[in-house]
């Protein structure tokens, strides 16, 4: 059982229920702005981002045309999540060079470890 001093740590007081006679306070935060009828959040009759009129296709919408806009020396920006580069990926099949096979006593002499510890 944990000792707690009631003078230093008073027991928690439950919150009082809201009074039914008090006026309701509006929630804090940004006030939503009503949109005009027929308009989406980004403009346009169809509610699209670019705001193009209905039935017309924008010239830059297709990926093929977008790829032609970039020179061949510079690739177009990728869409979607890019793979994170890990520095260990390039050496995933790396094997350390094989150690020369010495007998145990020579190994101990090289490391200056007393032999009686083994």
UniProtKB/Swiss-Prot annotation:
Start-end of Basic and acidic residues biased regions: 43-52
Amino acid composition bias (Pro residues), ranges on this chain: 24-37
Ranges of biased composition (kind: Basic residues): 75-85
Region described as Disordered: spans on this chain: 1-103
Superkingdom field: Viruses
Keywords: Early protein
Start-end of Acidic residues biased regions: 55-68
Family: Belongs to the papillomaviridae E4 protein family.
Protein name: Probable protein E4
Organism: Canine oral papillomavirus (strain Y62) (COPV)
Lineage: Viruses, Monodnaviria, Shotokuvirae, Cossaviricota, Papovaviricetes
